[in-house]
Amino acid sequence: METVSLITILLVATVSNADKICIGYQSTNSTETVDTLTENNVPVTHAKELLHTEHNGMLCATGLGQPLILDTCTIEGLIYGNPSCDLSMEGREWSYIVERPSAVNGLCYPGNVENLEELRSLFSSARSYQRIQIFPDTTWNVSYDGTSTACSGSFYRNMRWLTRKNGEYPIQDAQYTNNQGKNILFMWGINHPPTDTTQRNLYTRTDTTTSVATEEINRVFKPLIGPRPLVNGLMGRIDYYWSVLKPGQTLRIKSDGNLIAPWYGHILSGESHGRILKTDLKKGSCTVQCQTEKGGLNTTLPFQNVSKYAFGNCSKYIGIKSLKLAVGLRNVPSRSSRGLFGAIAGFIEGGWSGLVAGWYGFQHSNDQGVGMAADRDSTQRAIDKITSKVNNIVDKMNKQYEIIDHEFSEVETRLNMINNKIDDQIQDIWAYNAELLVLLENQKTLDEHDANVNNLYNKVKRALGSNAVEDGKGCFELYHKCDDQCMETIRNGTYNRRKYQEESKLERQKIEGVKLESEGTYKILTIYSTVASSLVIAMGFAAFLFWAMSNGSCRCNICI
């Protein structure tokens, strides 16, 4: 048995002293993990977060310019001309409009605007407005300077409140043709006094009719006289209306009372983001590509979870916390020490922390020492594929779907609920698609990395042929001496197998001879052991028979 052990040690020593080259991959101290279709929290050397999660908490300019911030005024207050609103905003361009939640200057005289949400959307979608006079004061032969205490003793700056003059209110008949070449937004109203007395004091009669007509509309109005709850100290109301007069169209108004007549209209120009933000955020000295009600953000990432109401050049919103794409390898640290005397091992044993210049590479040992080098070609091809994956994800998710925080009246509550549900479901679909796409790409990336290592291993295996033997750990033990220059030819694919064939053949025969001698000795010892064991068993059986016959426990009768 001592002979067998000695031969085995000599054989191991013979193989261990061979020059060796291993194929491996990078390992780092990264704590990054990604999810795949089949695994969660897979450790990887590198990962790219695809989801932008931060904002600056400010109102910023966008690519279309600065926002229009209405500090104390609402949009309808600006449109109808609340006397407390700043008229200096005329002609100013905006990219989006900001209303403050605490704004108090809306409709000073109590009442409702017909289709208010549509009006706000129309106005905010423009980029600027210009006031234009529709009916000058000389149009009317009644009093046109009606005021209200609710409007700070004044009245709207874009409408005239027509009342009786000298105790009379003759029929007012006026028309205006749009020769501006652009659409004009015009506004009017109908007054509803609280009592018949107030009605007569203002318009001399209780039964009045007002008609407003263009080529597209024909509206007829009558007052609804009666007391209502006090609002702003008034029991009367005004119903507010609006329409758009297109180029070449004519507006005709005919009334014998209760008319709040158009005075100025608005020419709306350009196109903005069409968004109204109701927020107290402060204006910052910043320009962003994407603005939300929470703040602005700049990002090159394909997704964001800041707000689904983001506008501008924005990444697609998905309501998850993180979405990581694997852009590196499985991070598998070395599973064991490198064996006796620091012997090297290949990818079967885990990754290499010392491989920093590439994802895949080689490690070798020879008489000149130990060396490591990255395989730049396979690494670059893998990097190019991953770059293509990122672009592919962006392209696949590039279909625009912009959610707008729609405004609905109280009557349209159910419609608003349905709209929100549809928006939420579409967002859920986008989030699911994004997550699934990334899971698929992560699975594919990690599988490709495994394939890349195997391809590199097989490439070296084909190059070495019978000049080397695999050790089962991702390495090749060479049958010939291979200095650093020789190792470089293996790495770069210029290895000359024929040059080392004869030396390899002799070394292989030498090693195989030792193996055969070992095997022959083992067979002799096996036969010897078998024979010796059989003799021991036979002698033991004979001794048992002798003992049994001597004490009479066993008797042998021979019959002839």
For each feature predicted by the language model, list its residue ranges.
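Extracellular/luminal domains of secretory-pathway glycoproteins
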Residues: 2-560
